[in-house]
């Protein structure tokens, strides 16, 4: 069998991320066109984008799911293949920009080595740009910025660069300048080569390289000097030479910029218009020149069976370890598990260990995905992103690895859903079908939850926003042929603890014959509801007071009971449980008895621990003309909002603040009337906070009506 097609050094794993409508998918489509994957340019406006393959994406012109594909690129120099340049493999993931699908961005960034942040040349840093940027910060992902839509009215490259510096707190360094803007945008100036690149034809394939226009020479010199200084500041050898008045060579500068990009000290900024086919090839060159290969990234950390930290190097010679970052139901091949290989190799047909669940899995087939098309592979190597068919137990965030060398890699944390709706099938016969379909959709999407309201028996689905749940209901009908009636969206309240309590819980049924006996003592205490974990269970039982095999049953009982709080039947967040003692019966004890004892312990604790109602707080950003600012701020305050700050942006005011989600229903209509249709807003989930007492009483009394 042939070995690896491309060495690791010539592999790039990149994501495309941005605010909605910044042009991510259009950029991805142009990348596929220029790298020869597509022979025709896909278009989100016409619903023909390769990467937006779901029917819902094509109808709405937005990205919903992150699509993965692979393409190849050889460095271009003066629009000729660079002498001695070798072809590189690029694994590309296009992610959604809509806040409701933030999970897709989170899991993609977890497994990618780098990302291209796309910014609209007019809108600049928008709310979701900030969200995805913070997600990339969390995983310390190297990235570069592409200022897109340089051809549209109001485009301002320099304003966007300033916004990246001020709003994202990053050292954004332009390595290109635009030639013209709006309808006069013709090309870019390369600040390394100090040449002008003009795009002559509609498809951007005929490029003319000329001297920098006279009226831009001073500006180009100024920005080149600033670029050199920024790069030199990240390299001890270069800064020394620079301060002595010696300008480094382009080769030295590019090498230092690559190191600074990989260590997230610098964000190189490029520009273009993906829709008008300008600047995309130069972006691909920059990806090859400045973005990391898997070998440039820090060793991946994990834990062995004893909980000791171990490291895996990105090498084919290491034992196999990979992270499953996405599960998808494919109508043709069944359950697909997307995974990123961090070390070692994997053959189709072999067995692996799911170290997270301690279950053996068989790799039926390995597929290379091209959006929703697939190609069979015999083997995958370190650094690869692929999908496996045949896994039964694996879910998002699980580690799969070599059975002889178990390791558990750091899992992913996902936000809690903020909106609930009640759902029921239109026919009685559809009940089971709907249950199965919802379970499959919940397996795919960790931010989508399904539960049953114990009081009414209704099925409640919860997600990150109205669009998120609308897409779920649409998929029920299209993919699973289940017609459903859906209630009005409700706020997904949660419940929490305020006090520490110590509970002694015994479940005993011993009235002749085989009995039931489970007894546990558990200390419950509140923990941060917005931390990385919303529930933590520890066992400090000693001396076999409770046999080891029954401890997980106590935990399962507590987790089950947490699905329904005592105030309004809402799920409970922010609980730490320490099972420290108990007792058992040689004959009558079993898992079920301890599960019931755990459940009873939690319900008892919930009544005694000062239960409170928690509500989702949204980060809200409103853009309005100056004249309406006072009215809009007053309205936000009347909605229990907290104003964080305001700033000027192109003649408008941006108001930022935090508002409870319950107060934001119908806000778009209010904003329209207060600003005569000239205001715009966006919001995304920030935290869960306690509901004020007077509001809590109102919410709970409305629920019982």
Curated annotation (Swiss-Prot):
Which SUPFAM superfamilies does UniProt cross-reference here?
EF-G C-terminal domain-like (SSF54980), P-loop containing nucleoside triphosphate hydrolases (SSF52540), Ribosomal protein S5 domain 2-like (SSF54211), Translation proteins (SSF50447)
What GO molecular functions are on record for this protein?
GTP binding; GTPase activity; translation elongation factor activity
> Domain tr-type G, which positions?
9-295
Q: Does the keyword Nucleotide-binding apply?
A: yes
Please give the CDD domains that the UniProt record associates with this protein.
EF-G, EFG_III, EFG_mtEFG1_IV, EFG_mtEFG_C, EFG_mtEFG_II
Q: Which GO terms describe its biological process?
A: ribosome disassembly
Which SMART domains does UniProt cross-reference here? EFG_C (SM00838), EFG_IV (SM00889)
Please name the InterPro entries in this protein's record: EF-G-like_DII, EFG_II, EFG_III, EFG_III/V, EFG_IV, EFG_V, EFG_V-like, G_TR_CS
- Give Gene Ontology CC terms: cytoplasm
Look up the coiled coil feature and give its residue ranges: none
Residues at which GTP binds: 18-25, 94-98, 148-151
Give the record's keywords alphabetically: Cytoplasm, Elongation factor, GTP-binding, Nucleotide-binding, Protein biosynthesis
Q: Which domain of life is it from?
A: Bacteria
List locations, semicolon-separated: Cytoplasm
Q: Which family does it belong to?
A: Belongs to the TRAFAC class translation factor GTPase superfamily. Classic translation factor GTPase family. EF-G/EF-2 subfamily.
Q: Which NCBIfam families match?
A: EF-G, PRK12740.1-5, small_GTP
- What task does this protein carry out? Catalyzes the GTP-dependent ribosomal translocation step during translation elongation. During this step, the ribosome changes from the pre-translocational (PRE) to the post-translocational (POST) state as the newly formed A-site-bound peptidyl-tRNA and P-site-bound deacylated tRNA move to the P and E sites, respectively. Catalyzes the coordinated movement of the two tRNA molecules, the mRNA and conformational changes in the ribosome.
Tell me the protein's name.
Elongation factor G
Give the gene name.
fusA
